[in-house]
Amino acid sequence: MKLKTNIRHLHGSIRVPGDKSISHRSIIFGSLAEGETKVYDILRGEDVLSTMQVFRDLGVEIEDKDGVITIQGVGMAGLKAPQNALNMGNSGTSIRLISGVLAGADFEVEMFGDDSLSKRPMDRVTLPLKKMGVSISGQTERDLPPLRLKGTKNLRPIHYELPIASAQVKSALMFAALQAKGASVIIEKECTRNHTEDMLKQFGGHLSVDGKKIIVQGPQKLTGQKVVVPGDISSAAFWLVAGLIVPNSRLVLQNVGINETRTGIIDVIRAMGGKLEITEIDPVAKSATLIVESSDLKGTEICGALIPRLIDELPIIALLATQAQGVTVIKDAEELKVKETDRIQVVADALNSMGADITPTADGMIIKGKSALHGARVNTFGDHRIGMMTAIAALLVADGEVELDRAEAINTSYPSFFDDLESLIHG
């Protein structure tokens, strides 16, 4: 796919698609609750559609009509054995969280995904689930998909310290803990996104959170709810960066989720000197309107507890850093290596091929700015965030063309991305 290049300004206002993390969880909680759940503004990307289909395969009635998802919950013990293996597509969130959901189901399932998912380690989830009494295994010692799982009605509670900062592992264990008899204690390495905790309370569940320690008493019952999904800050991040680095630009992003566990990119933009305004804050929905303008940027250091708050935004932050004066250092981000691709290497290769100066490290990158970008051919390797990062980088290219291979990967999280880009170019 040939990308738009040499764009002189971006203007306009858009609503980004619904938050991917909240969309996944709304389907899961709605399915496990008793009674009806209605979900508004859900993301209809490929990953979320995979989760929706999996729960249909598990016997849950889910209707998508007039822009509203209606779920007839079956309760914590109401899932049915599927006729066939469960297809998770490209979605690491789906396979990990649903492994926890099925921990208390007394039937056997196989879960598989595409080529990319089949390279992602699941031992981070399988090891603690085995401690709870689940029979679960995959391929190689890292438990790569496909996974075979047989849950148990006699699920044991767990006391577990996460060796990595992972909201997916935490959430999988919370879903399992809801079905165990007794109190489970989950201790995070660093605080990660807390959508599962927030939504558990919304659906009538109970938990105790004390810093990095989460206690879930099981078993519990949940009750169907109305869920309004805010815009995804991970999708908004591409426009935040575009508005900062494309000259003569001003972008207004409406209804963006600003959950405090997800706003690391806002901290980074401010540390780099970017012009960013937050208005129309809704404290209940945890959403706001974000306004950015073209800015002169300076390098910064991104590390430690900040990393889990922006892990998915690091590819586009790397592009932002190529347009800042000085050096930006990203470290403590080894988790990037086991995303849809090895995002440390793939980001560095993609942007360096366009003229950036990025040195990959074991746990991050060293980025020297400011770089003039030129044309190149870039492969997403099936990673949606690499595709969108490259499309934003291409806007700065004055010399040559930018070809993007496997651009369809963007449909994973943002099917209307190129439509929104066109509207901002012509705004």
UniProtKB/Swiss-Prot annotation:
In which broad location class does this protein mainly occur, judging by the first location in its UniProt entry? cytoplasm
List the molecular function annotations (GO) for this entry: 3-phosphoshikimate 1-carboxyvinyltransferase activity
Instruction: List GO terms (cellular component aspect).
Output: cytoplasm
Q: Which E.C. number(s) belong to this protein?
A: 2.5.1.19
Keyword terms, alphabetized: Amino-acid biosynthesis, Aromatic amino acid biosynthesis, Cytoplasm, Transferase
* InterPro entries listed in its UniProt record: Enolpyruvate_Tfrase_dom, Enolpyruvate_Tfrase_sf, EPSP_synthase, EPSP_synthase_CS, RNA3'P_cycl/enolpyr_Trfase_a/b
User: Could you say which residues bind 3-phosphoshikimate here?
Assistant: 20-21, 25, 166, 168, 312, 339
Q: What is this protein called?
A: 3-phosphoshikimate 1-carboxyvinyltransferase
